[in-house]
């Protein structure tokens, strides 16, 4: 489960995107403050909902540098989060910045 009272931001390279129902997910490699690289699992909305919101399975690809915000896992040693937004700074393409872009 996630700490819905907290919000974190991670920046890194997308290594995998699973565009499916009931939940999509992305995996990113992101540097920690100590310089170590961590693999984060980020839960997202289902593919059918995301497609209605304008995304496709190729909207984000492995190798994309992304910034993701969301709620972290309640377990601090578990590198997972629930996505609130994702941004690709290279072209400012993102999701989660419009009020209709949510999976609740």
Region locations from a protein language model:
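Short aromatic-glycine-enriched beta-strand elements
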Residues: 20-31
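Short, basic/aromatic beta-hairpin or loop at an interaction surface
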Residues: 35-47
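Short boundary/loop segments of OB/S1/cold-shock single-stranded nucleic-acid-binding domains
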Residues: 1-8
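OB-fold/S1-family single-stranded nucleic acid-binding modules
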Residues: 73-101
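Hydrophobic core residues within well-ordered beta-strands of beta-rich domains
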Residues: 8-10, 66
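Conserved hydrophobic positions within beta-strands
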Residues: 12-14
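Short, mixed charged/polar active-site loops
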Residues: 9, 36-39, 94
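Short nucleic-acid-contacting surface segments enriched for D/E, G, S/T with interspersed K/R
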Residues: 51-68
